[in-house]
Amino acid sequence: MDVYGMSSPDLLRIDDLLDFSNDEIFSSSSTVTSSAASSAASSENPFSFPSSTYTSPTLLTDFTHDLCVPSDDAAHLEWLSRFVDDSFSDFPANPLTMTVRPEISFTGKPRSRRSRAPAPSVAGTWAPMSESELCHSVAKPKPKKVYNAESVTADGARRCTHCASEKTPQWRTGPLGPKTLCNACGVRYKSGRLVPEYRPASSPTFVLTQHSNSHRKVMELRRQKEQQESCVRIPPFQPQ
């Protein structure tokens, strides 16, 4: 039978293409399973080597029988343990018993010792003084202030040299010296207004027509006095 111009023997058989035999499938699956198992075993034990190329290292007898470590790693661990022991040996076992080092003291230049002259004894240097020296060494008394004789009466009472008052709360300085004026006269003298026409009302020399204790009244009295003096000095006009 011709199909598309070709004879039947030349065509491929469908049975050859559709081969459902299980031999290759099961063989390939077993191969994959064995390779997966070998890879898993190698991942669990990364230090496993083929028996033909691997020789078991010599084990150290210092460690326990359960722990098997290669000689190179054991030497490294032994060096590390010794280093740690040496490091901890530098510290004291009991930190409370540590002694604090004293602070460094900077010593300066040593002082040079010089011989000092012995202090003179009082008994050896004291000499008795003569009577004349003793008289001069005695402190002279402070001289008392001598006031003006006019301010002191014969019986020793003090009085004002301007108004002759003997009673005043305070004595003040005047033209004749300290404590020569009464309080009223001393205040006016200090301000420059002490004139002969001024008298306190309590003064024993107070005259009403000649003296006053008011500054305005005193100025009027002085003006009147000046006018009187000018009239006396100018002679009256005498026609010839």
UniProtKB/Swiss-Prot annotation:
GO molecular function, one term: transcription cis-regulatory region binding
UniProt name for this protein: GATA transcription factor 4
Record localization: Nucleus
Pfam families reported in the protein's UniProt record: GATA
SUPFAM superfamilies: Glucocorticoid receptor-like (DNA-binding domain)
Entry GO CC: nucleus
Function field: Transcriptional activator that specifically binds 5'-GATA-3' or 5'-GAT-3' motifs within gene promoters. May be involved in the regulation of some light-responsive genes.
